[in-house]
């Protein structure tokens, strides 16, 4: 049994398979998941698990080069936006419209659906390298 890091076998497998610039999405429970993109559904009830809890665990186990967020999060969920900025200090940040964000999710290796039920609590994580 693993002692640390991501214990969820599906998430661990996706993280292990990422190459430089590949993307994964951590999403609230309302983000549409495009056909053909791997869905890892963690939602058990509204709010559980939280977006920020899942983000923290994934970020601790992933080299992240860039982060993409919907620009709407700035005005509609400033608290989550601030927490993302505090948790992810190193990567570059990019803000796009929510419609563009949804288009970008079509290229993700996986979308991790949380129980989060606050507006625009979604992030695209772009894989970096560890060297």
UniProtKB/Swiss-Prot annotation:
InterPro entries in alphabetical order: D-ribose_pyranase, RbsD-like_sf, RbsD_FucU
Keyword Ribonucleoprotein: no
Gene3D superfamilies given in the database record: RbsD-like domain
An MF annotation (GO) of this entry: D-ribose pyranase activity
Pathway recorded for this protein: Carbohydrate metabolism; D-ribose degradation; D-ribose 5-phosphate from beta-D-ribopyranose: step 1/2
E.C. code: 5.4.99.62
Keyword Isomerase included in the entry's annotation: yes
Location in the cell: Cytoplasm
Pfam families referenced in this protein's UniProt entry, alphabetically: RbsD_FucU
Active site positions: 20
Coiled-coil ranges (or none): none
Database matches in SUPFAM superfamilies: RbsD-like (SSF102546)
GO biological process: D-ribose catabolic process
Binding residues annotated for substrate, in chain numbering: 28, 98, 120-122
Keyword vocabulary terms for this entry: Carbohydrate metabolism, Cytoplasm, Isomerase
Quaternary state and interactors: Homodecamer.
Entry similarity comment: Belongs to the RbsD / FucU family. RbsD subfamily.
Primary role: Catalyzes the interconversion of beta-pyran and beta-furan forms of D-ribose.
Protein's UniProt name: D-ribose pyranase
């Amino acid at each position: 049994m693993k002692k640390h890091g991501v214990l969820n076998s599906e998430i661990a497998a996706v993280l292990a398979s990422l190459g430089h610039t590949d993307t994964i999405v951590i999403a609230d429970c309302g983000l549409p998941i495009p056909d053909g993109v791997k869905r890892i559904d963690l939602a058990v009830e509204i709010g559980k698990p939280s977006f920020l809890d899942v983000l923290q665990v994934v970020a601790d186990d992933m080299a992240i080069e860039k982060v993409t967020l919907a620009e709407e999060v700035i005005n509609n969920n400033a608290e989550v936006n601030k927490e993302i900025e505090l948790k992810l200090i190193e990567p570059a940040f990019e803000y796009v419209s929510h419609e563009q964000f949804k288009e970008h999710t079509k290229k993700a290796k996986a979308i991790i659906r949380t129980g989060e039920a606050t507006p625009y609590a979604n992030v695209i994580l772009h894989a970096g390298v560890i060297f």
